[in-house]
């Protein structure tokens, strides 16, 4: 675990989640990321890293009823993640969230802003969810964890690097990429088991540090490091939008993947007030 823990961060929010879990009731565990978080449809649900983390909570807090919200979508980065997080994840009011975009984002100012905005949206939720950043990797060891670590440090977040953990083992000849991945980036069941175990090791460590203080003071969210522009993004469903002006456009919801406002009349006009 020592190699995988990029930063322990501030554990106050996680202690709050532990305290809530000890009381019983209902809690929500969330994960948002790309195809690694979603995982292949061929992989059994219980073998996916997010479900392995869910199992940790269920095992350690048997009195509590847990729900997992897996908000992973393949081939998407934190830019789209920041737009959809309210609908796909935060609407369920999660208590603990894993953020995984280190292999989908690029090392650019735009992605730094969207990654930060996504994190700020989660941290600003009324229930003050705990957040952990997870850094996966490609076959060549590349990802954008260095850029994301700067943001994580700014917000004092726990950060877990799958990349650091497996790269050390691979360099020592104790692990081959083919054992954990079927292609250049997507982990197989063994790779997911490693990722889930790394998160769970961190949770074990944090649980031992918890002193059951029922009067925790959650630190205020600091000013943005780069920008707060993506903190206020929102994804609108076309069906729910009411045009302020419409000439020749109709909403077509019949297609599975092509729902939206459509027109076959040249010169048609449609306007929305946002």
Where are the language model's segments positioned?
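N-terminal secretory targeting modules
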Residues: 1-31, 37-44, 55-64, 174, ...
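Alpha-helical cap/lid subdomain in secreted, periplasmic
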Residues: 22, 48-71, 76, 80-211, ...
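A short, flexible beta-alpha/helix-coil linker loop
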Residues: 35-38, 103-105
